[in-house]
């Protein structure tokens, strides 16, 4: 159903949809304090993720099967019901085997520290990260904090308890 009272707020090329029926309408701005590389930018106007850049004083070499924490120099203040997910960049993963170790990394709305990225080298050769390299993506998304209701039994479904391949591959 369409919400005809919905609005879109633009902040540094970030469009946030707000609706009177949604739970995340209290705030629509995302405040940031950025380092020398400025605020995160999207690769194209339709990109969902905002590129995070390495904020380094010297290059970092990631050996195969090694995980390192990379600074971004970025600090965020997120609205109450919006979180940010730190995701790998597909080209970095495909071409070099570099991924986000704890993907998706989660930035909670009450976190005020620097956004850092755990990069992992899944490749066979070392990889060098330089200052200003685009190392990951940041995806903003609303989330819901439900109330839990304890019950004796859950309702039955066709699937029921089947999991981990129970629906087959073909």
Which residue ranges define each predicted feature?
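DUTPase catalytic domain/fold
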Residues: 1-170
